[in-house]
């Protein structure tokens, strides 16, 4: 199935490092890890080269992801089928599926990535593959807390693996028990991020987790002694931003956090108080609002190593793949592209992330001042600023 009004077939990395990028999905049975287990896509440096277009994985692994996204957006399956066939088509991620890990470095730093509400493990591939091209191993978790647009788990029945869908849970704003539901979800998300870190530690020790449901065909032994477990970071967008804060509050094994346009609502007072690891906040001024920023400012005050920056002319989805899935005119129509070019927003997100991960607050601030001051400010503000 081709796309007729789309950008190039492979999503090009915006700030490519020295490495080609490989990827591999890993799903582990919940009976081993408890609850619903773990599903994630690992992105990592590779020395391999793509044989042909089929080496690159599809951005939409199954049509159900589009249908679930449509449900989240209030669009019918029929309409999403049209959008998928005419716009998305066989869009592919810029990484080589089933590639081997690069042997050019002794060890690789690790990052766990948490998607936003209605997201998936593939919706941030531009960012994740770009980080991997700079020498990071990125574990993009697909959350099973009913916040992903759609996901699934595999269960054994009569000797065969059966796919059980996990659909998005739609919650009306101000619905009774809304906070309780969202806080429970963020708790589940934290559990999955910690599980991802634990699985990476197992792989680094040369141990393959029990009951691997997806990924049995891969040589995981190559991860042995290749990961820098002492400096793990957690990164997330929106709901994933809250997840990254709550994860770093839960365990200091996450040495740093990065929050893209974070949604603070799901965090309870304990999580807010305990989020004290050095954190980079990258906000979109047009999306943030005062009530949300009040919580964020409280967390920012916990550590002198925290840094908050605001992107001007950007949109909430500028950290995801969506601005690059659609041609510019359609991206603007759908509200996934703002006044500032998506490529510039993504470049800033990637380069500031690298600067913060490698050189902390001072490194990110220096880069912002030298390169991105035309559209990124140290002022913390939301949409109310424009109503004055």
UniProtKB/Swiss-Prot annotation:
One of its GO terms (biological process) is lipid catabolic process. InterPro entries: AB_hydrolase_fold, PAF_acetylhydro_eukaryote. One of its GO terms (cellular component) is cytosol. Pfam families: PAF-AH_p_II (PF03403). Disulfide bonds: none annotated. Transmembrane segments: none annotated. The active site is at residues 238, 261, 316. It catalyses: a 1-O-alkyl-2-acetyl-sn-glycero-3-phosphocholine + H2O = a 1-O-alkyl-sn-glycero-3-phosphocholine + acetate + H(+). One of its GO terms (molecular function) is 1-alkyl-2-acetylglycerophosphocholine esterase activity. Belongs to the AB hydrolase superfamily. Lipase family. This is Platelet-activating factor acetylhydrolase homolog 2. The gene is paf-2.
């Amino acid at each position: 199935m081709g796309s007729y009004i789309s950008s190039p077939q492979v999503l090009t990395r915006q700030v490519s490092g020295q490495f080609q990028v490989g990827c591999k999905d890993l799903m582990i049975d919940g009976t081993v890890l408890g609850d619903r287990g773990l599903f994630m896509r690992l992105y990592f440096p590779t020395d391999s080269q793509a044989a042909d277009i089929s080496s690159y994985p599809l951005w939409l692994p199954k049509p159900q992801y589009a249908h679930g996204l449509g449900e989240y957006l209030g669009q019918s399956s029929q309409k999403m089928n049209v959008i998928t066939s005419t716009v998305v088509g066989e869009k592919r991620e810029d990484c080589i599926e089933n590639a081997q890990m690069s042997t050019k470095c002794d060890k690789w730093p690790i990052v766990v990535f948490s998607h936003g509400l209605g997201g998936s493990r593939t919706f941030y591939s531009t960012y994740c593959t770009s980080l991997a091209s700079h020498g990071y191993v990125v574990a993009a978790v697909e959350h099973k807390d009913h916040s992903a647009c759609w996901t699934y788990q595999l269960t054994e029945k009569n000797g065969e693996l059966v796919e059980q869908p996990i659909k998005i849970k739609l919650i009306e704003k101000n619905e009774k028990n809304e906070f309780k539901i969202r806080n429970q979800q963020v708790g589940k998300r934290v559990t999955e991020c910690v599980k991802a870190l634990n699985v990476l530690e197992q792989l680094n020790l040369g141990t393959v987790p029990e009951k691997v449901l997806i990924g049995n065909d891969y040589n995981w032994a190559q991860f042995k002694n290749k990961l820098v477990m002492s400096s793990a970071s957690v990164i997330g967008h929106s709901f994933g931003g809250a997840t990254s804060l709550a994860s770093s509050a839960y365990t200091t094994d996450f040495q740093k956090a990065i929050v893209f346009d974070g949604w603070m609502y799901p965090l309870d007072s304990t999580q807010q108080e305990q989020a004290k690891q050095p954190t980079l906040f990258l906000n979109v001024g047009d999306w943030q609002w005062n009530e949300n920023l009040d919580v964020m400012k409280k967390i920012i005050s916990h550590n002198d190593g925290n840094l908050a920056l605001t992107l001007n002319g950007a949109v909430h989805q500028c950290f995801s793949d969506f601005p690059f899935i659609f041609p510019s005119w359609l991206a603007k129509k759908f509200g996934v592209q703002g006044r500032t070019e998506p490529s510039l927003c993504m470049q800033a997100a990637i380069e500031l992330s690298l600067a913060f991960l490698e050189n902390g607050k001072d490194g990110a601030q220096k880069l912002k001042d030298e390169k991105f001051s035309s559209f990124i400010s140290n002022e913390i503000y939301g949409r109310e600023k424009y109503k004055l």
